[in-house]
C-alpha cells in the first residue's frame, strides 16, 4: 500500500565515506557528529523524508541515518532507499538480500519508499518489487534515472499486479532539464506520480559555491 509522501526529500548521498560516498564524490567529510544537528533541525521543521541508497558510502549513509532514526518515533520519519542493480549480483533473491541489509542498517522492518536506482536491467528487476510490496516490506515504489520509455515500462509491469510507479527521481535543475524536455514531468503530472529532482542546485554551482575559480576538490568524482 502506497504511503503519502512529502514533496520535499532530504538527500543523504554525501553522508559517510567510501565508494559513492561524500568524500570521494563531493569532497565532503560528513559523519554523525556533523549530521546529527542537521537531522534534528530538519525533523523539528517538519522535513521528515530522508533519501539514501544501499550504495551510498558503501552503506555508511544508511548506517548513519539508521542511528538517527533509532532516537525518534518510527512513524515520525519517512525512509527512502534504493536497490542498485550494479551491486546486486545474479542470485534470484538479490533484491530481497539487498533490502534486508538496508532494513538492518536503517533499523526498520518497512521501507516507506523503495527505488530501482537506475535502469540497468530494469525490466529484469522491476518484477522483484512486486513481492516486496505485497508482503508489506515496502509501501511506495519509485524509479530513478529512468527515461520516459523506461518509466512507462515499469508502470506496465507493476500494473499487471495492481501496483504502480508512485515516484520518479531524476537529475533536474536549471542547467539540466532533460526530464522536462523528454515529457517526463508531464507524464508524472498526468499519472499522479511525484517527481523528485536531485542535484537541483548542482551541488552548489547554482549558489555560487563552486566555479572555474573555485572548483570541486581535486580528485573527487565531481571535480
Language model region names:
Residues 1-77:
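N-terminal binding-site loop/beta-alpha segment at the start of enzyme catalytic domains
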Residues 17-23, 85-90, 206:
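A short acidic, helix-capping loop that chelates divalent metal ions and anchors anionic groups
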Residues 10, 35, 42, 50, ...:
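Conserved, mostly hydrophobic/aromatic
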Residues 53-62, 86-91, 117-124, 148-149, ...:
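Acidic-and-aromatic substrate-binding clefts and catalytic sites of carbohydrate-active enzymes
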Residues 27-42, 89-107, 122-127, 148-155:
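Short, acidic/polar
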Residues 75-87, 114-117, 169-172:
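A short, structured active-site edge motif that brings together acidic residues
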Residues 2-5, 44, 66-76, 100-107, ...:
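Acidic (Asp/Glu)-rich catalytic clusters
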Residues 119-223:
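Beta/alpha (TIM)-barrel catalytic core signal, keyed to glycine-rich beta->alpha loops juxtaposed to Asp/Glu
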